[in-house]
Every structure is written in C-alpha cells, then in structure tokens.
Amino acid sequence: PQAEYVYWPGCSGAYDARNRKVSRALVALLRHAGVDFAVIGPEEKCCGDAARRMGNEFLYYQLATENIETLNAYGAKKIIVQCPHCAQALERDYPQLGGRFEVVRHAQLLERLVAEGRLPGAERAGAQAAFERVTYHDSCYLGRYADVYDEPRAVVKACGAQVVEMER
C-alpha cells in the first residue's frame, strides 16, 4: 500500500471482538478526517512483544524480522498504532533489527485531528456526549512507558464529556 500511513491494528484490534469494534471505529474516523492510510492485512503478524516479554527471543525475532521486511517492502514510513504494546515494540525494539518507522499512537493522532478541525468535537457537530462524566484509565504502556496522558483526555473532552480523574 502506498499511503502516508500504515494502520497497524495489532492482534487485539484484529482478533478480539470488542477491539475489532475499536478498529472499525478508528478506520471510520480516519476516513472521515481524510487521512491517507493503508492496511497491510493478513501479511501483518503479531508484533512479538508478548513473546519477548515471556522470554521467547527466537519467536520475537522471527515475528519482528518478518514484519520489518513486510513494512519495508511496502515502503512504510509512518505507522498508526492502536495497541500500546505494538507501539512499544515498533518504536523501541524494532530499530535494533533495522526497523525504523515513525510510530504514531492513535490517541495522539485523534487529538491532532480534532485540534486541526479535521474531526469535529461534539460542540461543532451539534452532538451530545453519550456520557456526561468519564474516567479514563491510562494503560501502562501508553501512560507510564510512552508518557501519553493528555491526548486521550483531550479526545474525551472533545466528545463533550467531563474527564474525572480516579483516586490513586
């Protein structure tokens, strides 16, 4: 696929029923915003993060090198990543094997598209939020490892909801 971005849904975004809904919703938002993206599809393998974390370096290496070869064959430069674990692998682990890509986390891209006016917030769309108050859970890999905290909250606020922080 020759596009500005490759969208990488990851294993959970491709196989888990609930996360497939997230993938479809993200694709709809990207299309609405006019983002030039492509999907690799069945050639995308698991990023290998889980295998590596469990100590199976051989399987990680096999998956990662196959993915890098596939991404390079398609000329991928920028990758929209839905799964924080995949983002971690693509951004921090793959360069050790020659995979150098600009990793864009979907929450950050959505926030930017709202800020640019390419995605309307609830106010501009004349819509009402599905929920008035929302508590957002920071996943470990998105928050602690990637330091992405503000963008997801900005997207929730743009949807017209108040973000209420959890007690720590």
Region roles according to the model:
Residues 1-168:
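Iron-sulfur cluster-binding electron-transfer modules in prokaryotic oxidoreductases
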